[in-house]
């Protein structure tokens, strides 16, 4: 094997490594987007459950019926779990976005309320 063949193989290997690195970066971004969407949907689901419970309670009051006791929603626990998993729980445009390991004072304020 001569020098030009070795250099060509090395250049091809470098190009392949760069392509794999680029693909890995794209997959990482896509994974973060999917996880953020999942968190947003989980939070929306919790909000909808709360809304449904309020509707059922108001209808029961109108009809004079008693509702069976349900366990209260653990909203704070859910928010704490999401924050621990690395997502913003503060109000605003960061809500549901990945924190990338940094603490957020706004999120901590939400948890302390």
UniProtKB/Swiss-Prot annotation:
Keyword hit for Lipoprotein: no
Record keywords, A-Z: Cytoplasm, DNA replication, DNA replication inhibitor, Metal-binding, Zinc
Gene Ontology BP annotations: DNA replication
Name the record gives this protein: Replication initiation control protein YabA
Function: Involved in control of chromosome replication initiation. Inhibits the cooperative binding of DnaA to the oriC region, thus negatively regulating initiation of chromosome replication. Inhibits the ability of DnaA-ATP to form a helix on DNA; does not disassemble preformed DnaA-DNA helices. Decreases the residence time of DnaA on the chromosome at its binding sites (oriC, replication forks and promoter-binding sites). Tethers DnaA to the replication machinery via the DNA polymerase beta sliding clamp subunit (dnaN).
Recorded coiled-coil stretches: none
Principal localisation: cytoplasm
